A protein has these predicted regions:
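C-terminal, non-catalytic "cap/extension" segments appended to globular domains
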Residues: 1-4, 17, 133-144, 250, ...
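Active-site recognition of the HExxH zinc-binding catalytic motif
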Residues: 237, 366-386, 407, 412, ...
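Long, K/E/R/D-enriched contiguous segments that form extended
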Residues: 276-325, 384, 436-442, 447, ...
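Catalytic zinc-binding patch centered on the HExxH motif and its immediate surroundings
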Residues: 299-304, 337-357
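A well-structured
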Residues: 1-298, 584-591, 595, 604
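Short pre-active-site segment immediately N-terminal to the catalytic Zn-binding motif
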Residues: 301-306, 356-376
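Conserved helix-loop functional segments at active or binding sites
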Residues: 315, 319-326, 352, 381, ...
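Post-HExxH zinc-binding segment in Zn-dependent metallohydrolases
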Residues: 399-427, 435-437, 441, 516
Length: 606
């Protein structure tokens, strides 16, 4: 049995990028799209309910057909981005599928514009009711405004897009400098997570200085986006900056408030304590901003072969549920995993859903604990897609609040398996510390970013604009509230708000990560408590529903209510438990610790 990370086999989809079946499938899809438009464009409101139901089902099948070709093209491209034929094939395929689907753009637009009376009449069809939650999401961004206001919204959208392009162009043109040499933000970002403290500090400072040099331009973009959003929200009746995102996520405002307040309340007991422990491990009272994600020094990380990772992950899923274990095993047996690290392969991981086929996984396995957990994470997505594929292409389009449920749950199963198998106290210590680093990023950091966004948008609404010093202050205050007194957070990191442009491109989406992490943690805690009969069966039934129900309804079979702070506190309590265990292990691992670390910290003037 080899331990070489595998390559995937895409031939069950198409034999190669030259497979004539690709052209046949796209031609068939183009014909279907033209017929679809002839049948329905301008006619949706007056349709018979049965015809409306058939239109949705046909729209679903058409999306599934184009999704298959698009998925194949993306997988080929991301597996080797240097192959010019792959690049050309990917670009050509994207252009063709976009052109095909553009013929159907009217459908969602007309559904969004339906009066409530017309929609209620159409929804008497059984097939249409099957797609009820999808229709609800399509209508979430419905705008019922006069023509003058709509025209202004269009103008503002164009201004926002132009401003965001300026943001990207400016960021690309920054001359980042480290040790007198030009470098890139991605290289600096990687060094900011280095085990070498001096390197972390210098890289972080170089990143901050680079963004600071263009802060005035970035601030002008922030103001443009925030002002245009304020206008849009006012005209649509949204009372706070986050409400429009809540509506598109199909989440009540009270649920988001309960999540945010629960995370805020847990910050001292979880985040502050964890960073204080990190300072203690380094032999000091405080650590710097760039030390917050540093790996534990003095402990050699354990390495895993791919076969070992496979065994850990499959054992984790098998121990939870045999059917889920078999679904996971199918990815290995059917060569649906590309885990081989190689040049020109796109960084990162993904699970690719295919409504008319089986999902695939891409990652680059390097043998670290994070790689083992990433494998479990992506297999969780894959299992979710397999169980939900009966819902069709539209029923697999999960909102951000639930799309990470199965992946995080699978990661937790694998983490517990790793922890149970690990007998070395130092390695258990490292496992728990790495886990908490991820929790800080996925939960507490995201809520800090959420507060930063709120501060910026509220300032613009109150004062008409926000200045660079005010943005710096909003950023620093939000980070400090999350990190607590054990982290030094000053002007040396105050311009790093410019490194998160996604907050402008998709405002207020980041709480979705914390929602997913906390919701799944709470669900996992319920599983570990053992009080729910047939938990694995109920869990699989929940996943099999895909995107056909609101997030809050999915948890009803477990007796859980996401609008109650107590729900969120269950998951946050599990995170606190990790910190408790780290505190218990700390005394044995900090004796006679690493004078070199302390000495090094003094050399960089912290």
């Amino acid at each position: 049995m080899t331990s070489t990370p595998p390559r995937w086999d895409l031939t069950p989809l198409y034999q190669s990028i030259d497979d004539p079946q690709i052209g046949k499938d796209l031609s068939a899809a183009a014909m279907q799209a033209r017929r679809f438009a002839l049948r329905g464009q301008g006619k949706i409101a007056a349709m018979r309910p049965a015809d409306f139901g058939k239109m949705i089902a046909d729209y679903d099948r058409l999306n599934a057909k184009t999704d298959k070709v698009s998925a194949f093209a993306e997988m080929v491209y991301t597996a080797d981005r240097a192959d010019k034929r792959n690049v050309a094939f990917y670009e050509k395929t994207q252009a063709r599928t976009n052109a095909i689907l553009s013929k159907t753009d009217f459908f969602e637009a007309e559904i969004a514009d339906l009066s409530d009376e017309a929609l209620n009449r159409l929804m008497t069809d059984e097939t249409a009711r099957k797609y009820g939650f999808w229709i609800e999401r399509v209508r979430a961004d419905r705008v019922d405004l006069d023509d003058k206001t709509l025209a202004q919204l269009d103008k503002n959208a164009a201004k926002t897009q132009k401003a965001l392009m300026l943001y990207d162009k400016t960021a690309d043109e920054i001359d980042f400098t480290l040790n007198g040499q030009k470098t890139t933000s991605s290289d600096l970002y990687a060094m900011a997570y280095s085990a070498d403290e001096t390197q972390r500090y210098k890289a972080g400072l170089a990143m901050n200085d680079g963004y600071k040099s263009k802060a005035d331009i970035f601030a002008s973009v922030v103001n443009t986006v925030a002002k245009n959003k304020a206008f849009s929200d006012e005209k649509q009746g949204f009372k706070s900056p986050v409400e429009s995102r809540n509506k598109s996520n199909q989440i009540d405002n009270a649920v988001v408030s309960a999540l945010v307040s629960s995370v805020d309340e847990a910050m001292p007991a979880v985040a502050h304590r964890y960073y204080a422990l990190k300072a203690k491990w380094a032999g000091r009272d405080k650590i710097g901003y760039w030390d917050r994600n540093a790996p534990v020094s003095g402990i050699k990380p354990r390495r895993y072969t791919f076969d070992e990772a496979k065994d850990i992950v499959l054992s984790a899923y098998d121990s939870f549920d045999k059917e889920m274990g078999e679904i996971a095993r199918g990815f290995f047996d059917e060569k649906r995993i590309d885990a081989e690290p190689r040049p020109n392969k796109e960084p990162g991981e993904y699970a690719m859903p295919i409504a008319n086929g089986k999902p695939y996984i891409k990652m680059s396995f390097g043998g670290t604990t994070n790689d083992v957990l990433a494998l479990a994470h992506e297999l969780g997505h894959g299992i979710h897609y397999e169980l939900a594929k009966k819902q069709g292409s539209l029923g697999m389009q999960m909102p951000v609040t639930t799309e990470e449920t199965a992946s995080i749950f699978g990661e937790m199963l694998a983490f517990d398996t790793l922890l149970k198998r690990e007998k070395d106290p130092k390695q258990r210590f490292a496992l728990l510390s790495d886990k908490m680093n991820r929790v800080m990023l996925t939960t507490f950091r995201q809520i800090a970013l959420h507060h930063y966004e709120e501060d910026i948008h509220n300032t613009v609404r109150e004062k008409g604009a926000v200045s660079v010093p005010e943005i710096n202050s909003a950023w620093t205050n939000a980070q400090q509230k999350m990190m607590g007194p054990a982290v030094i957070n000053d002007e040396r990191s105050s311009s790093c708000w410019a490194d998160v442009p996604h907050l402008l491109k998709t405002p207020f989406y980041v709480y979705g990560y914390a929602y997913g992490e906390c919701m799944t943690s709470s669900l996992y805690q319920v599983y570990k408590d053992g009080k729910i009969a047939d938990f694995p069966k109920k869990y699989k039934e929940m996943l099999a529903k895909g995107a056909t129900e609101r997030p809050d309804k999915l948890l009803k079979p477990f007796g859980l209510d996401v609008s109650k702070p107590d729900f969120w506190k269950q998951g946050l309590g599990m995170m606190k438990g990790y910190v408790d265990r780290l505190e218990q292990l700390t005394p044995d691992l900090t004796q006679n610790r690493n004078a070199a670390v302390i000495k090094q910290s003094r050399t960089v003037g912290r």
